C-alpha cells in the first residue's frame, strides 16, 4: 500500500521517519479514504486506530482485519456494508401482516425492519411536534369519549390478533390523545421535558429487557447504578464511602424505604416479630410535606394518627420550635419518637425546611433524620443554589428524584442511606433461586435483596447516559436556567393588579404561586364571598386551558387559601417567551370571569 514517493505536502520533511504519525504520507490519506468508504461505526474505529498507531504495517493489517470482520455481519447489523440499504423503507402492506410475522418468525427480518421503521417514524414525528410551539400541549377528550372509541382507535381488547396496520394506528392515536409533557408550555407537573439522550437510553433499556436484582443478568447496569449512587452520595456531602442506596419506582417508595430503614436501625426485631414487638412509635413531618409520608405510615403499620404534623411558617417551612415541642409531648404521652422527615422543596410552595436546625433536634433526641429532596435534590448540582439544602449532609437518608429537576425521563428516583448494610439487613430474604452465595463472582454486587421488590426496572441507564452527555456542569446550567425563569415570572407579575402572590418574597424554587384576579374581583375587599368566588377562578381557567390545549399549569388550595395557580418549571426547553405566553393565556381565558 505504501508509496515511496512523498507527496508535495510532505516533501520538505523527507528526512523524517515515515513510520511516525507526525507526518501525513499518502498512505495516511489512503487509509482515511478507506475509513470514509466504510460505515460510520467502522470508519470511526479505523480513524481512531490511525490516531493511535505508528506502524504502517500494523495499520495495513488492522484495516484489512476490520474489513474482513465487516463482511460477516448479517442483515440487521448496523454495520452492513451498504449504509443506504441497511434500513431502507419500502412500501409494505401491513394490513396483511401480524405480530406472528415478525422476528423470531422465520424470514421475519424484513417485516421486522419495516415495522420498526414505521414506529420510529411515529416517534420522531412526535418528538418534532413536541418541540414545535404551534403544536397543542394536548388534544383533550373526556373519558367517556375515549372509552366509547374514536375513529379507528378503540381501547377494548380483542380475542383475535389485529393487523400491524391497526397496531400502527394505535401507536399514533395513543400519542395523539395523550399529553405532551415534554412541550415547552407544559407546566402542570414537577416532571416535565423530553431529553433526547434520556430517550435513547430508555429505548435501549427496553431492548435489553433485563432485571436489576443480580449482577448475573444485569452486569453493566448494576455497576452503573453503584457508580451513580456513589456520586450522588458524594454530592450530598457524605464523607463515609460505605454508604448505600438503590433506585426505586418513585419518591413515595423512596420515602417508604427511609422509614423502614429507620425502624430497622433502632428496632431490628421488627423484621421477624412485627410491630407488636416494638414500642408505640411516632413519626414527624411538616404539614406541607408530601402525602407519601402518611401513606407509608399507614402501609408500614404505624397508622396515620402516629404521623404527627409539624406547623409551618407562612412560606411553608417547618417551625423547629413546634417540632421539638411535639417530640416532648409525644414522649410524655408514652410514645417513642423515631423519625423526622424534612422536606427540601415542598410540592406546592417549593419550600426548603431548615435542615440544620432540624438536625440539631434529631441529634439531641437520637432520631433518624430523613430529607425528602425528591423535588429539590437537583439543586445540589448547582453551586449557586445548593446552599438552600444546607445541612443535608447530616441526614441519615435522602430521597432524590432525578426525574424532576434534572429532567431524566420517568421513572428515576433514588433512596440514599448514609450507613451501609441497613437496606440489606432490613429487606434481605436470601431467595435461593436468585442469591446463591457460591456464584463465580463477587455476590456483593447482587443488589436485589436490598429492595422490597423482586423484579426491578432498569432506571439507571438513561440517567447515567445523560450525565455522561451533559456532565455535572450541564445539569448545573440546566437547573440554573429553570430557576432564572421562575425569577422572571415572579418579577413580571408581582406588581400587576391582575395577579396576586400567595406569599411574599421571591420563590426559593421554581414554584411560583399566584391568583389570577378577574376584573370583577379587582379592588373588592377581602370577604368570605370574595374568597368563594376567587376559589372558582383557577378551575374555570384550567378547564378552558385544557379545552384549548395551548398550555397546562396546575392549581390547588392550601389550608384555608382559595384555589391558586402553582407554576413549576423543570423543562430546560422552556424560555421567557413561554412564560410570557402563559401569562397572556391566563389573562385571555379569564378576562370574562
UniProtKB/Swiss-Prot annotation:
The cofactors named for this UniProt entry are: pyridoxal 5'-phosphate
* Residues at which 4-aminobutanoate binds: 189-191, 566
> Which keywords, in A-to-Z order, does the entry hold?
Decarboxylase, Lyase, Neurotransmitter biosynthesis, Phosphoprotein, Pyridoxal phosphate
CC terms in the record's Gene Ontology section: axon; axon terminus; cell cortex; cytoplasm; GABA-ergic synapse; inhibitory synapse; neuron projection terminus; neuronal cell body
Residue numbers bearing the Phosphoserine modification: 77
Where in the body, by tissue, does this protein show up? Expressed in brain and pancreatic islets.
- The modified positions for N6-(pyridoxal phosphate)lysine read 404
Question: Is the Phosphoprotein keyword given for this protein?
Answer: yes
* InterPro entries (UniProt xref): PyrdxlP-dep_de-COase, PyrdxlP-dep_Trfase, PyrdxlP-dep_Trfase_major, Pyridoxal-P_BS
Spell out the Gene3D superfamilies in the cross-references. Answer: 3.90.1150.170, Type I PLP-dependent aspartate aminotransferase-like (Major domain)
The EC number on file is 4.1.1.15
Q: Which reaction does it catalyse?
A: L-glutamate + H(+) = 4-aminobutanoate + CO2
Biased segments, Low complexity type: 1-12
* GO MF annotation list: glutamate binding; glutamate decarboxylase activity; identical protein binding; protein-containing complex binding; pyridoxal phosphate binding
Which CDD domains does the entry mention?
DOPA_deC_like
Q: Does the keyword Transcription apply?
A: no
- The UniProt annotation puts the region (Disordered) at 1-22
GO BP, one annotated term: response to cocaine
Q: How does it assemble?
A: Homodimer.
Q: Which family does it belong to?
A: Belongs to the group II decarboxylase family.
**Biological role stated in the UniProt entry:** Catalyzes the synthesis of the inhibitory neurotransmitter gamma-aminobutyric acid (GABA) with pyridoxal 5'-phosphate as cofactor.
UniProt protein name: Glutamate decarboxylase 1
Which taxonomic lineage does the organism of this UniProt entry have? Eukaryota, Metazoa, Chordata, Craniata, Vertebrata
Q: Tell me what gene encodes this.
A: Gad1
